[in-house]
A protein has these predicted regions:
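Compositionally biased, intrinsically disordered low-complexity regions enriched in proline and serine
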Residues: 20, 36, 102, 111, ...
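Long, polar/Ser/Thr-enriched low-complexity segments
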Residues: 1-60
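Context-gated lysine
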Residues: 9-12, 20, 26, 38-39, ...
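Short, low-complexity, charge-dense intrinsically disordered segments
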Residues: 165-203, 207-210, 214
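Charged linear interaction tracts used for macromolecular binding and regulation
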Residues: 34-163
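Short intrinsically disordered, low-complexity coil segments enriched in acidic
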Residues: 1-4, 162-167
Length: 214
């Protein structure tokens, strides 16, 4: 109980919006607590841990997005998603809600009006000392009036490394104009070659921009 309570307390303002649709009979916080305890915890008989894959930091009837990416680069988390406006009740003007939870430090950073659904991208600045920590990321949406909220989705985090040196193995993530994610994972080639491959899609100075080039 205390584990879930501590997690939700850390993101209480986010939960207040994220569970607004369920705040008529009981508080948004209590609604989130109820869901988490029923659906998003693991227990070995003596210890309870949160299943962050099943956890929902928002829940509601608004159409969510079903795929997206989260990329850590130069002190910020870059979020990209497919704009599914027009499907169900999803609208271009829906507001993106971003959340990054630092599991090691047990603190969170979030933005409940980071971008429009139609933007397809947003960024969230992070503290410099978070780079080596385990980060949990969630993406959700709410309607303009805030009355409808989507179920959140957890995004796995990719790390975009600097393209420097001559022979190191790298994992480089490139966000290209098609809004698809291309990953060169642990390539056994020199970094300048990777940089040349990426230059087809991106100027090297723009590798950490979340917005696809036009």
């Amino acid at each position: 109980f205390s584990t879930v309570f501590s997690f939700l307390k850390t993101i209480k303002p986010f939960i207040r919006l994220g569970y607004k649709e369920f705040s008529q009979e009981k508080s948004a916080f209590n609604s989130a607590m109820s869901y988490m305890l029923k659906k998003a915890v693991n227990s070995n008989g003596t210890e309870i841990t949160i299943d962050f894959n099943r956890a929902l930091v928002s829940m509601g009837t608004l159409m969510p997005v079903f795929n997206g990416t989260a990329t850590l680069c130069k002190g910020q988390m870059l979020f990209n998603w497919y704009n599914n406006s027009g499907i169900g009740n999803a609208e271009n003007a829906d507001m993106a809600m971003l959340l990054v939870y630092n599991k090691d430090k047990e603190i969170a950073i979030y933005n409940t009006e980071a971008a429009l659904r139609s933007d397809g991208y947003a960024e969230l600045p992070l503290p410099n000392d978070w780079y080596d920590d385990e980060l949990i990321t969630y993406l959700s949406f709410r309607s303009v009036d805030g009355n409808s909220v989507a179920n959140s989705i957890r995004l796995s985090v990719s790390i975009m490394e600097e393209i420097t040196g001559d022979t190191e193995k790298r994992e480089v993530i490139a966000l290209v104009p098609s809004e698809k994610l291309f990953s060169f994972q642990h390539l056994n080639i020199a970094s300048p070659i990777v940089a040349h491959i990426l230059s087809v899609f991106y100027d090297e100075d723009r590798l950490c921009e979340s917005r696809p080039p036009t």
